């Protein structure tokens, strides 16, 4: 797992515990980093014989054409490599969390805007360590089949043009689920 920040790190760390998925979620792979730095980590994972799952927010690409081009280049570069899964979310991973509760592809301008709507469904949600380090919020996201609903919703949105809010985190969940089932 390669990710951008604390929210992603804690989510995937707790998801592994809650769902019994098997993957490495090393804190050093989760920090604010550029797409170029992510590519270096992807290459390191591939050289080590692993599968690189890269989780990133795409909101920076709306206003920064250089970053937009870098994300596009990264996605294009690894498009045919089954060992690399790019799980970008527009505007942020909070949109992925929202899909656990709502079937929406509404355009959100920022992660803060998504978080405000998310708090209607998950009132305690905060982007700070004292909230994120507790497993309960991820357990709540996964309860009552909400994780699979989020996957279905995100998959349906992915069939549309990427002009609206979207999340490709479902690709990682599909991989984790497939690997878990193959071990049975």
Give the role of each language-model region.
Residues 1-9:
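Catalytic nucleophile-elbow at a beta strand-turn-alpha helix junction centered on a G-D-S/GDSL motif
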Residues 2, 55-57:
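Generic enzyme active-site microenvironment
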Residues 33-37:
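Short, charge-patterned binding micro-sites
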Residues 9-29, 39-51, 58-184:
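C-terminal accessory helical subdomains adjacent to catalytic cores in phosphodiester-
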């Amino acid at each position: 797992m390669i990710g951008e920040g604390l929210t992603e790190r804690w989510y995937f760390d707790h998801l592994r515990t809650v769902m019994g998925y098997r993957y490495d979620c090393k804190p050093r792979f989760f920090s604010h980093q550029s797409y170029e730095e992510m590519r270096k980590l992807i290459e390191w994972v591939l050289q080590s014989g692993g599968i690189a799952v890269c989780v990133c927010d795409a909101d920076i690409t709306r206003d920064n054409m250089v970053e937009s081009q870098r994300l596009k280049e990264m996605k294009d570069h690894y498009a045919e490599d089954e060992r690399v899964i790019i799980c970008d979310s527009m505007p942020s991973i909070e949109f992925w969390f929202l899909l656990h509760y709502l079937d929406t592809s509404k355009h959100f301008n920022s992660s803060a805007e998504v978080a405000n709507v998310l708090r209607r469904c998950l009132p305690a949600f905060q982007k700070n360590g004292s909230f994120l380090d507790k497993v309960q919020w991820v357990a709540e996201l996964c309860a009552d089949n909400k994780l699979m609903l989020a996957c279905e919703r995100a998959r349906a949105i992915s069939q549309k043009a990427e002009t609206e809010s979207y999340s490709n985190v479902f690709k990682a969940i599909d991989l984790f689920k497939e690997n878990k089932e193959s071990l049975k």
